[in-house]
Amino acid sequence: MTELTDIEIRRKKALFRAQRRGFRELDLIFGAFADAHLMTLEEPELDHFEALLSVPDWQMFDWVMGHVAVPSAYDHEVFARLCAYRNNFPS
C-alpha cells in the first residue's frame, strides 16, 4: 500500500469538511465543487480553499450568494471559481 503525500491527506480532509459543513446549502455547493475540483488544486489554492472552509457558515453563505462584499483576504481565484460553480449549479 502506498502512503499518501501531505497534499493528498489535506485534500481528503478538505473534501470531508466541504461535504459536511453543517449548513445544507453550503454542503451542496462546497461538496459538489470539491468533488469536481479539489483533486486538481495545487498547494496555494488548497490553502485558500481551507481558509474558506474556516469561515462561519452564515458569513460564507452571504458571500457566496452575493449578499455582502467579500473581504479582500478571501477574494481570490478559488473563491471566484466557487462562485462561478455556484452560478452554474443545477437547481
What is the meaning of each model-derived region?
Residues T2-S91:
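Positively charged, polar, low-complexity stretches
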